[in-house]
Amino acid sequence: LNLTIGTIMDIKALTPNLSISPQILISEMQTVAEAGFKAIICNRPDGEGPDQPSFQEIEAAARQYGLQAQYLPAETGKVRDEDGKVFGQLLLTLPGPVLAYCRSGMRSTTMWALSQSGVTPLPQILEASQKVGFDMKALVQRI
């Protein structure tokens, strides 16, 4: 997967089971489902931006299209190691493929990178992150 949906949504495959994107909109949920996703993880806190739909709105729209939705918010620049562990557990329990999103995709990518500690070799984590446009080198000591 490396889809551009509409003019706003840019979905990039991080792994075969996980893609990341910037903020998704209610109006794009059908397209997300039609693209084959089975679950969504929201990593953006409610109220971060004036034009963003709440997680409750996202979850309701997701349900309409048979998608599961989970809320794991983190403030920009404040993703904790624990967030990465919970993210990893969600990836193991949610049906895939999964779409994770935040404002830009950086927090979702960071949580994935942290979740892969001891699972995926570090060079592969860095390479996959770079391919979707995010540099995780600053996280090396935490992975």
Where in this protein do the model-derived segments appear?
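Substrate/cofactor-recognition hotspot
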Residues: G105
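Cys-dependent protein tyrosine phosphatase-like superfamily
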Residues: N2-V98, T110-I143
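Short cysteine clusters
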Residues: C102
